[in-house]
Amino acid sequence: MHRYRSHTCAALRKSDVGSTVRISGWVHRVRDHGGVLFIDLRDHYGITQVVADPDSPAFKLAETVRGEWVIRIDGLVKARTEDTVNKTMPTGEIELYAQEIEVLSAAKELPLPIFGEPDYPEDVRLKYRFLDLRRDTLHKNIVKRTQVISSMRRHMGEVGFTEYTTPILTASSPEGARDFLVPSRIHPGTFYALPQAPQQYKQLLMVAGFDRYFQIAPCFRDEDPRADRLPGEFYQLDLEMSFVTQEDVWNTMAPLMTSIFEEFAEGKPVTKEWPRIPYDVAIRKYGSDKPDLRNPIVMEAVTEHFAGSGFKVFANMIASNPKVEVWAIPAKTGGSRAFCDRMNAWAQSQGQPGLGYIFWRKEGEKLEGAGPLAKNIGEERTDAIRTQLGLDDGDACFFVAGDPAKFYKFAGEARTRAGDELNLIDRDRFELCWIVDFPFFEWSEEEKKVDFAHNPFSMPQGGLEALQNQDPLTIKAYQYDAVCNGFEIASGSIRNQSPETMVAAFEKVGLSQADVEERFGGLYRAFQYGAPPHGGAAFGIDRIVMLLVGAKNLREISLFPMNQQAQDLLMGAPSVATPTQLRELAIRPVPPVKKD
C-alpha cells in the first residue's frame, strides 16, 4: 500500500465496503457521540467520515487529534445505516472504521476558523492565507479559476490561436497608470518596467507574421485598489489577430466567451447574440459605458416636456443653456411616495440637490400623476411623459436636468439604485454586450488639453483624414469593450498600423514625432517595414471568474492577493532593501516630503 494513501477523501463509495484502505488529510472536525469518536477527514478532493470506537487500537490516539492536524488513517470501509446516510456528500453512504492512525503534522491553535463564513478581519485572513485557502468556498473558487483558464486555452486553440509569451522586463510606456519600475544593476540609473499589458509586443508579433496570438498575460499597474481591481498584478486573456476588421474580432470572441460562460454558469442563462451598443447610446440610455443590462430601466430625454413649463427650475435651465437636457429614469412598480422619498434622500446623500419625481395612481377610473413636479407642469405634460415612457398605475419616474456630460454618471447611479431597490434585476443570468464607437480623444480638465480617451494605439475612424480635418473631440475610434452585468470584462480595438497616422494622433495630445520615436521606437520602426491591418482585445480573467462564482471582490478568487494598502501580509512585501542591494543598484533612498 502507498505510504500515505490508497484513496483520496472523496473516492470511497458503497462498492468499496469491506476493503481495507488508507487515506490522509486534515482533521476537519471531531465529534464525540457517546464515547465513539467521529472524525471528518478532508483533503483537496472531499471529506470522508472516520469512526474510532473504544475497542479500536486507534482510539487512544484519536482522542488526542485536533482540528487541522494532518493524519494518516488505515481502516475498514463499512456501509452506513440507512438513517445515517448523508446524501449531500459523495462519500455519504460509507464510513471508515479506523484501525491505525499516524499523526503526520500537528497544528497550533488556529488564528481563524477554516469553515463557515469568513467573518474575521481581512488582514488576518491575508496574513494566514494558507489557512484561509482551506475554506471550502475559497478553495473551490481557486480551482474554478484554474478550470476557466484551461477552458480559455482550449477554446482559443480550437479557433486557430497560438499561445506566445512576451517579456516581463520591458520599457516604461504610458498605458494610463503608473509603472512598477525595476532598477538595472548593469546600467546604473536606468530602470526596466513591468508590463501594464503586452500591447506593443503583441502588435509586433503581428508585424512579424504571427497571425493569431494569445497569452494568459500577467499585467502590472501601480494603481489604487478597488473591488473590481487588485493592487499590483492581474491576469488577462490577451489576443491579437491579423487582417481583421472589428466585426471579425467580435464574431470570433463573442461565441467563444459565451461558450466559456455557459460551461461555468451552472445553468444560468448567458447572452448568445451580444448587442453592439454605441458608446453615446450607452451613456444616454444607461448612464454608463459598462451598463448592467439585467436592469430593465432605460433612460430617455424628456426635455421638450419641461421647456416652457410651470416647473421653473428646469424651464429656466433649458431656456438659458442649449446644452441642458432633462433625462427621465422610469421606475416600474416604484409608484409609492415612500420609495420616491427614499430615492430623493439618497440623491441628497450623493451631493445632489434632490431627485424630482412623478408617480402615477388611479383615482377612480382616471390615471393621475402625483408629486410636486406633476402639479407644476400640469396634467397634459405629465400624461405626455407617461405615454412616452410606457408607464402605468403604480409606476414612477425620476428626473435629472443639466449638462449631460456632467450629470450622466449620477443618472446612471440613480438607474442602478432604483433597479436594486425595486428588485427589478434578475441576478441569475449573465448579460453580455459590446460597447463600440468610443471617443478617440477627450478633454483633460486637469491638464487643460486634449488627451487620449482610451488606447492610444487604436485606429481613429476616418484615419489620417479625420485627424487632419475634424475637431479631435468628435473623432471616434475603432475601439470596443465587452461588458457583463455592469462590469467591463474586456477592452480592444483595431490598431493604427500607419506611421503617419500614429504620429498625427500623438501630435493631437502634444507629442512630437521625436517623442513618438523615443517612447514607442520599436513599434514605430516596425510599422515602416510592412505592417498588416490588425486588432485584438484583452479579457480580464479575474473579473470573469469573480462574476462566474458570484464573489464580492477579487480577493475571493485570487491565491495570494495584497490588501487594500498594496501590502502582501503573508510574505512581508514590500520590504526594505539592504544597504548592499542599494549600493549594487546605485540607489540612494530619499525620504518622502511630508505634506503640511
UniProtKB/Swiss-Prot annotation:
| Biological process annotations from GO | aspartyl-tRNA aminoacylation
Q: Which Pfam families match?
A: GAD, tRNA-synt_2, tRNA_anti-codon
- Check the record and name the PROSITE patterns matching this protein: AA_TRNA_LIGASE_II
Name the segments for region: Aspartate. 199-202
Record EC number: 6.1.1.23
> Carries keyword DNA damage?
no
Residues involved in L-aspartate binding: E175, R221, H454, R495
Sorted alphabetically, the keyword list is:
Aminoacyl-tRNA synthetase, ATP-binding, Cytoplasm, Ligase, Nucleotide-binding, Protein biosynthesis
Entry's localization field: Cytoplasm
Name the reaction it catalyses: tRNA(Asx) + L-aspartate + ATP = L-aspartyl-tRNA(Asx) + AMP + diphosphate
Residues binding ATP, per UniProt: R221, D222, E223, E488, G540, I541, D542, R543
UniProt cross-references to InterPro entries, sorted A to Z: Aa-tRNA-synt_II (IPR004364), aa-tRNA-synth_II (IPR006195), aa-tRNA-synth_II/BPL/LPL (IPR045864), Asp-tRNA-ligase_1 (IPR004524), Asp-tRNA-ligase_1_N (IPR047089), Asp/Asn-tRNA-synth_IIb (IPR002312), AspRS_core (IPR047090), GAD-like_sf (IPR004115)
Q: Where is this site: Important for tRNA non-discrimination?
A: H33
The record's section on Gene3D superfamilies has: Bira Bifunctional Protein, Domain 2, GAD-like domain, Nucleic acid-binding proteins
The domain of life for this entry's organism is Bacteria
GO CC aspect terms? cytoplasm
Q: Which GO terms describe its molecular function?
A: aspartate-tRNA ligase activity; aspartate-tRNA(Asn) ligase activity; ATP binding; nucleic acid binding
**Task of the protein:** Aspartyl-tRNA synthetase with relaxed tRNA specificity since it is able to aspartylate not only its cognate tRNA(Asp) but also tRNA(Asn). Reaction proceeds in two steps: L-aspartate is first activated by ATP to form Asp-AMP and then transferred to the acceptor end of tRNA(Asp/Asn).
Oligomer status and interactors? Homodimer.
Family affiliation: Belongs to the class-II aminoacyl-tRNA synthetase family. Type 1 subfamily.
Please identify the protein, giving its name as recorded. Answer: Aspartate--tRNA(Asp/Asn) ligase
